[in-house]
Amino acid sequence: MSITSPPVEVSVLTDSIKNLLEKNFLRVVVKGELSNVSLQTSGHLYFAIKDSKAVLNGAFFHFRSKYFDRRPKDGDYVILHGKLTVYAPRGQYQIVAYALTFSGEGNLLQQFEERKQRLAAEGYFDPKRKRQIPSEARTIGVITSPTGAVIQDILRVLSRRCHQFQVILYPVTVQGPTAAQEISRAIQVFNQENIKIDTLIVARGGGSIEDLWAFNEEILVKAIAASSIPIISAVGHETDFTLCDFAADVRAPTPSAAAEIVCKSSEQYHQELQNLLRHLSSHSRQFIAAKKNLLSHWKKHLATADFYHTAQQTLDYTRLSLERTLDAKLEHYKQHLAQYKRWLKSDILIRVEKHLSNLNQALESAIKNKLYSNKVSLHQLYTSRFKNELPNLQHRTQHAKHLLNQLSRRLHFVMANSQETKLQRFARLQEEFSFMIQHLLTKAKERCQSVQEQMASLNPKNVLKRGFAQLFDFNKHSVIISAESLKQSDLVRVCLQDGEAVLSVKEVWLNNDKKG
């Protein structure tokens, strides 16, 4: 790309670099020291591998499902097999590993393979020299540690499966620089003519390749091959293989399985072996066919694998960032919460809260009593005073009108029989009296109108028109004025402006607290 080339976007340039890297570094093997090791809950491993001059970031997807027995840590020296790629969101190149061996294990595995090939070429693993385990094994020699769980497992199985047997234990160390020589010496002792042994079990529990290395030593392999007594090798777990397994007459996946083999008759053992071979043959064909199909499937989708890994790595980084942010937020809120708790525990605040609670209860009680008293008084006023006063005012008005008529007639009579001055005086008196009567009538009308308005405002039916309702006890027919008199499932008669209804109480709250 020359200087005169048109500009490209960062993502396009990054993709070009990624394609070049993946094309030219499809398979790489790199060794170094691990740092910043992080095994995510998704099972993916993120790390950096370094030496004294450079650092290379890396990822191992689905690491946990492939290497469940050992977890790498900072400072481990490892050998990685993988490919180079680019993590586009950060614009950094990295190695995506698909195999990992610890540096020490790598050397041991190489020694294992070289020694295995050489001893096989010398005939130590030849199937023709292997012997069958006697069908009636009565005396069994066991070469193992006397203090481990291995000897206990063997004895437990023999006690359960065999009726007559004798176990002769030759105690040895099963790990360390002298272990191979001790085990070889034990085999030679058992092969002496004066000791009658039907079969030998060489056993040890599981461990790392370093722990089991004594069983890969040449001196022990040759001692097993030279034994005239059939030997069962029961070293490690089912997934562990040592050179002793190849040299022994029978390999047992576990020490307990070795005891099971001893207890079986030759015919039963042969039949089970044939069944196992048929099962393995069938299962192998199915397994190979399935793996071929899976390989074909992944070849078709190989182009999308990098996108998936990139997306998965982005999700893991995002989750880590969110976890750090969440932890910081939680710590911040915890500090505030602790401060609030210290404030709330203050004696002054407790006393104030108690005093406020007492005042609140007293105020609520006084308000309830006052409201109830006012309601009763208003009801009594409505039923007695206003009902009686309205007819009285009407009667007084009629009486005033009657007096006015009488005075009017008397004035006319006096005016007709009096002198001019008396007529003037009566005219003035009539005018004053008329004004007084009119004033009284106006006051009486205003008072009457005020009373009628108060009666209308206190009339329960008018109150109902404004959206309110009256509650009556369904059984006692009394007015309900407090929520304390109600409980769940009570029946209540409700009066509205245009009718009535019967309701059932489901829940009751007092001062924002749920009653039932």
Swiss-Prot record:
Gene behind the chain: xseA
Similarity comment: Belongs to the XseA family.
InterPro entries: Exonuc_VII_L (IPR003753), Exonuc_VII_lsu_C (IPR020579), OB-fold_nuc-bd_dom (IPR025824)
Species name: Chlamydia muridarum (strain MoPn / Nigg)
CDD domains the record matches: ExoVII_LU_OBF
GO CC annotations on file: cytoplasm; exodeoxyribonuclease VII complex
Described function: Bidirectionally degrades single-stranded DNA into large acid-insoluble oligonucleotides, which are then degraded further into small acid-soluble oligonucleotides.
GO biological process: DNA catabolic process
Protein name as it appears in the record: Exodeoxyribonuclease 7 large subunit
Catalytic activity: Exonucleolytic cleavage in either 5'- to 3'- or 3'- to 5'-direction to yield nucleoside 5'-phosphates
EC number: 3.1.11.6
Protein's cellular compartments: Cytoplasm
Alphabetical list of Pfam families matching this protein: Exonuc_VII_L, tRNA_anti_2
Lineage, opening ranks: Bacteria, Pseudomonadati, Chlamydiota, Chlamydiia, Chlamydiales
Self-association and partners: Heterooligomer composed of large and small subunits.
UniProt key word Nuclease: yes
Gene Ontology terms, MF aspect: exodeoxyribonuclease VII activity; nucleic acid binding
Keywords in alphabetical order: Cytoplasm, Exonuclease, Hydrolase, Nuclease
